[in-house]
Regions:
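Conserved small/polar residues in nucleotide/adenosyl-binding loops
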Residues: 1-5
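A short, Trp-centered hydrophobic/proline-enriched beta-strand micro-motif
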Residues: 9-18, 61
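Glycine-rich phosphate/pyrophosphate-binding beta-alpha loops
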Residues: 22, 47-52, 94-95, 265-270
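A structural signal for short hydrophobic beta-strand segments in well-ordered beta-sheet cores
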Residues: 31-34
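A short core secondary-structure module
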Residues: 39, 43-89
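Glycine-rich beta->alpha junctions and the first turn(s) of the following alpha-helix
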Residues: 86-184, 266, 282
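C-terminal helix-coil-helix/basic helical segment that borders enzyme active sites and/or dimer interfaces
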Residues: 159-162, 182-245
Length: 287
């Protein structure tokens, strides 16, 4: 039922992993699910829940055993967002947008059938899912599109009366960015090809996440540089239907500041880049 409705877009899912005291150290999460016979009673809080205010359901990591090593007492639970006791509160991010949320659970009754796999083995399932999430966070298609946008803006923006793209320092930064992106795309295709054969991405997803987020952040940084002061104003209303006022600067400058600030977070979510470096070091060198 869950898979069918997800594939048909009838259900929108949110992810309930991070908590105020459990981000990079996710295993220290405090949300509990107490066995009450035919259901679990869930209490706790999740944070940074992306688009949780639109979600129909949320898959959560919850503590089902407090007497064992943290990773061994975690279960993977599916919860309907309209269940009594579930409350969503907005978090306004640095770019002024409402994209993420806090989700509170107060005596939420969840049927026992909503557990995924076996009780207390949720940590294993979550780690597996995160390898695919990190591969996606690399965002190769996004970066390719943003790079083309950067080249267009660099041709239109002037420096000392000449197109910015003719500036040797700036053009070399674009070239370095494109080289990094091409190398990352090849590595990404290799990783996806292996996944199509049934192999989990593993350490490769961590490498992609590290490099991909740095490329995405660098792209928005160069876009901001290319536009100069015109990148500063952000007027979301100028994208509304029927808005006829004169934009501040060229129309393509509108979302640049928002994108720049929003991209600061991507090296943190999905497992911070510092954590990913630890994963790579452990897998490669046994550190």
């Amino acid at each position: 039922m869950c898979i069918r409705d997800s594939l048909s877009n009838e259900d929108w899912w949110a992810q309930g992993y991070s908590e105020p005291g459990a981000g990079s150290d996710l295993a220290s999460l405090k949300t509990t699910a107490v066995d009450k016979g035919d259901h679990y009673l869930v209490n706790g809080q999740k944070t940074w829940t992306t688009l949780g205010h639109h979600a129909d359901k949320i898959f959560c990591l919850v503590k089902t055993d407090l007497n064992v090593k943290p990773q061994l007492g975690i279960s993977f639970l599916l919860i309907d967002m309209d269940t009594p006791g579930v409350e969503v509160k907005p978090i306004i991010t640095l770019d002024g947008e409402h994209e993420v949320n806090e989700v509170w659970f107060t005596n939420v009754k969840v049927p026992k059938k909503n557990i995924v796999g076996k009780e207390n083995e949720g940590w294993t399932y979550a780690k597996y899912l995160l390898t695919f999430e990190r591969t996606g966070i690399a965002g190769v298609p996004y970066s390719k599109s943003a790079l083309n946008h950067l080249k267009m803006i660099s041709k239109r923006s002037l420096k000392n009366g000449k197109p910015l793209i003719e500036d040797p320092i700036f053009s070399s930064e674009i070239a370095e960015l494109e080289i990094d992106l091409l190398a990352m795309e090849i590595f990404n295709l290799r990783t996806v090809s292996a996944a199509a054969e049934g192999k989990a991405p593993g350490m490769e997803s961590s490498l992609l996440k590290i490099k991909g987020t740095l490329v995405r952040q660098k792209t928005t940084e160069l876009l901001r540089k290319a536009l100069g002061p015109q990148a500063l104003p952000y007027l979301p209303e100028q994208f509304d239907e029927g808005w006829n006022e004169m934009p501040v600067g060229p129309d393509y400058a509108g979302p640049i500041a928002k994108q720049y600030f929003n991209m600061r977070k991507i090296s943190i979510y999905g497992g911070s880049n510092e954590i990913q470096k630890n994963i790579v070091a452990k897998a490669s060198f046994g550190l």
